[in-house]
From Swiss-Prot:
One of its GO terms (molecular function) is protein domain specific binding. It comes from Drosophila melanogaster (Fruit fly). Residues 27-152 form the Death domain. Residues 301-317, 355-367, 425-438 have a biased composition (Polar residues). The lineage of its organism: Eukaryota, Metazoa, Ecdysozoa, Arthropoda, Hexapoda. Disulfide bonds: none annotated. InterPro entries: DEATH-like_dom_sf, Death_dom, Tube_Death. Keywords: Cell membrane, Cytoplasm, Developmental protein, Membrane, Repeat, Transducer. This is Protein Tube. Sequence repeats lie at residues 262-269, 286-293, 319-326, 356-363, 453-460. Interacts (via Death domain) with pll (via Death domain).
Amino acid sequence: MAYGWNGCGMGVQVNGSNGAIGLSSKYSRNTELRRVEDNDIYRLAKILDENSCWRKLMSIIPKGMDVQACSGAGCLNFPAEIKKGFKYTAQDVFQIDEAANRLPPDQSKSQMMIDEWKTSGKLNERPTVGVLLQLLVQAELFSAADFVALDFLNESTPARPVDGPGALISLELLEEEMEVDNEGLSLKYQSSTATLGADAQGSVGLNLDNFEKDIVRRDKSVPQPSGNTPPIAPPRRQQRSTTNSNFATLTGTGTTSTTIPNVPNLTILNPSEQIQEPVLQPRPMNIPDLSILISNSGDLRATVSDNPSNRTSSTDPPNIPRITLLIDNSGDVNSRPNHAPAKASTATTSTASSNNLPMISALNISKGSRETLRPESRSSSSSLSKDDDDDNDGEEDGEEEYPDAFLPNLSNSEQQSSNNDSSLTTVTGTSGDNSFELTNDSSSTSNDDYACNIPDLSELQQ
C-alpha cells in the first residue's frame, strides 16, 4: 500500500468496516498533525475554543503512546495507555493561558495547544489524525470529532451515545401537516345570525352580532317618578352670603395693608405724640418721621410736673431717655459767655432737667461768639492775666452749672496755650509780644479748625 506525502491512500478501514475511500479525502489516519494545513487547524481550533474544550482534550492525552499502532480505527486502548500517565498537567494548561494573555486578542488558545502537541516527542510519539479523532471521541467532543471525520478523512461521523449530553439532537423541522376541523364553525353556534334577514346571509363582515341579548328585568327599590311631573332639583345650600362676608373682610384687610406704609413707628418714644396724633398721616416711603425728636420741651416738663404720681404708669415707656431735653435754644447758649449771672440763675433748672445727659447744645456756638473771644486773646500780657482770672472764675461757674458735662472748654484751652507760650519767652529769650502773636495766630487757627469740626445741631429745630 503506497501513501503520499499527505497520507492519502486506498484500503483504509472506516469505523471497523472494509470500505474504500475515494480520492476526495485530504488526509489519512496516519497523517501527522504537523502535516495538516494551517487553515484546517484554524477551523478545528475555533470549534475547540467554545467553552474552553481544548482544556479537556489536553488533559487526557496519554504519555509515551505509540501513535503508529493506535492510529487505526478502534486501535486505541485508552485505559492501557493512561497507565503510563498523562503527557500534560494543570501547570502546562496554566502556562498556555499565561502565554495567550501576552499575545493579541485574536490568537486562539486551542491553536497554541495543537501547535505545541503536534511538534513534541519522537517520531513514533508525534500525534496523527487517527489518534486525534479517537481522543476527541473519548473526551466526548463530538462536534470537533464530526468535523475531523467529515472534512479531514471524508468518513461518516462517529457513533454517539443514546442518552446523555453526547446524544444526537435532531435539528430537522417537522414536515407533518395539521388538519383543521371546520365542522366546529357550523350554523348551530350562530343561531342569531339566521334571524337577521336575507341581507345578513351574504355578508362577509367579521363584526356580526352572534349573541342572544336577553335583557333581565330587575325590580329596583328606588321609586321612579311619573312621566307627567317634572323632576325637582334637590335643595342646595346657599353660600353666597358667607362668601360675600369673607370677601368683604379680605377686601377691608387688603385696603388697610395698602394704606399703611412700611415706615418705622417712632411714636412709642414720646407718649404725648400718640395722644396728639391719633390718625396716621401718609408719609414718604422708607423715610423715618423725625418730627418726634423736635418737640416742645416745655410741654413735656409741664406734663411731668403736673403728673408726678403717674411717672411709673404704662403710658411712659421705662428706661427711655427724653431726647427733647438735648435740644435747647441756641441763643441761650451763645449768651452764656457774656452773661455769667444769667448762667448761674438757670443752672439749677438745667441741672435738674438734664438727668445725667451731656449738654450737646453747648457745642452749638455761633461764629459771632467765637469772633468775640479772639480779640481778648490778642490783648496785652496784663490783660491776659485778668482774663485768666475771669476764665478761671468762669470755669468754676461752668463746673457748678454743668456738673455732668464732660466736654472741654475751648476758650480755656486757647488761653492756657497762650500762657504757656508766654512763659516760654523766659527760656528762649525772645520778646513776649512776638511769641505771643505767633502763639495767638496758631491758637486762632486751631480754634477755626475746631469750629469747623463742631456739628451745627440747630438744624434739627428747623
